[in-house]
Each structure stands twice: as structure tokens, then as C-alpha cells.
Amino acid sequence: MAKMTRKPKGTPMSCSENTNVDAADPLETLDDGVAAAAFRRLVRHLRHRHDAQNIDLMGLSGFCRNCLADWIVEAGAPLDKAAAREVIHGMPAGEWKARFQTEATPEQLARMAESMTRNP
């Protein structure tokens, strides 16, 4: 299993990244192939559910598609931010935004801000 490492002090966290890995966590016993298959299924599900807006994902869970893109880069994918977002969105991020993203409401922005305070 790939070991997560702590970023240098002062490095910004992505969607409140938590790199504290507890070896006793059952998640750490998952085979990497199984974990990768589940991750790919999640990404494909989010590609299909473009009606689930990133702002709503942030408001409910404190992460979104863009966070997933950041996380694959932080995990070592040799991609820049734009390429990583294209992998997750299934198309360039600008195209995804133009086709599917709606204007965020003040309520959505407030939910996101409150949700982010609960991230580790």
C-alpha cells in the first residue's frame, strides 16, 4: 500500500487535506487495486451525475470534483491542475463548467463555508 507523507510546513492544503494515516484503520488494509477500482467508480458516478454541483458537494461533504483532481496530483500523478481536472471531469474543466455548472446562490456559498470549517 502506498504510504502517504506529510507535506512541508506552509504548503497549502487541498480541501483541508488530512495526511494523518492511522495504520490501525481498516481502510489501510484495502488492496490498492480494490481502492483504485472504487475510486474510479466514484469518479465515473460523478461524471454521470453532473447535476450534483461542486458547490453542493462542498456544502455537504467539504470536497468536490476539483478536490479529487488536486488529490490525485498530490498523490503523485504527473499532471498539472488542468490535466488532473480533465481526468476527473471527463472533459476540460472549462467545458464542464460551461455545460453543467450553475451560478452559486448565497445559501450554497454559506453552506460551503460552514462545511469547510468541519474538515480536518
Regions found by a protein language model. Give the residues of each.
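Domain-level signature for proteins that mediate thiol-based redox and metal-cofactor handling
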Residues: A2-P120
